[in-house]
UniProtKB/Swiss-Prot annotation:
Disulfide bonds: 27-38, 55-152, 127-144
Lineage: Eukaryota, Metazoa, Chordata, Craniata, Vertebrata
Record key words, sorted: Disulfide bond, Hemostasis impairing toxin, Platelet aggregation activating toxin, Secreted, Signal, Toxin
TM stretches of this protein: none
Function: Agglucetin specifically causes platelet aggregation and surface exposure of integrin alpha-IIb/beta-3 with a GPIb-(GP1BA-) dependent manner in washed platelets. It binds to human platelets in a saturable manner, and its binding is specifically blocked by anti-GP Ib mAb. It regulates endothelial cell survival and promotes angiogenesis by activating integrin alpha-v/beta-3 signaling through FAK/phosphatidylinositol 3-kinase (PI3K)/Akt pathway.
Protein name: Snaclec agglucetin subunit alpha-2
Domain of life: Eukaryota
Predominant place of localization: secreted
Quaternary structure, from the entry: Heterotetramer of the subunits alpha-1, alpha-2, beta-1 and beta-2; disulfide-linked.
UniProt cross-references to Pfam families, sorted A to Z: Lectin_C
Amino acid sequence: MGRFIFVSFGLLVVFLSLSGTGADFNCPPGWSAYDQYCYQVIKEPKNWDDAERFCTEQADGGHLVSIESKGERDFVAQLVSQNIESVEDHVWTGLRVQNKEKQCSTEWSDGSSVSYENLLELYMRKCGALERETGFHKWINLGCIQLNPFVCKFPPQC
């Protein structure tokens, strides 16, 4: 009997400790949750600037998606694959080449630096998109005026 109570208590402790790893927030209807953020694929094609503006209008802290890890990359690729028609070749991310003080640097539209890189090809174009030919797992730089669907991301509000 004592062993049963001990094991039951241990399982309860494990369950409670795991319950705070991402399941303690809710995203709005139509949004998907991953690692403390909410994501949504927007199918209506827009140029990069209009897509970023749209994302910032959806929620506080909203931006085009930044991808900070392989796990997040896989999540976003699956989300895009499930929601984008087969005719779409590219999907905007928040990746943008900035020309600051005559030095090119790449950063995300939310202001974070690029800590995880997964570029397929680096062209002299300024805006980053996911590439269909790679299952939306790799990024390519495109001209920012091109019209593409996109992914928005925001931290949920408490």
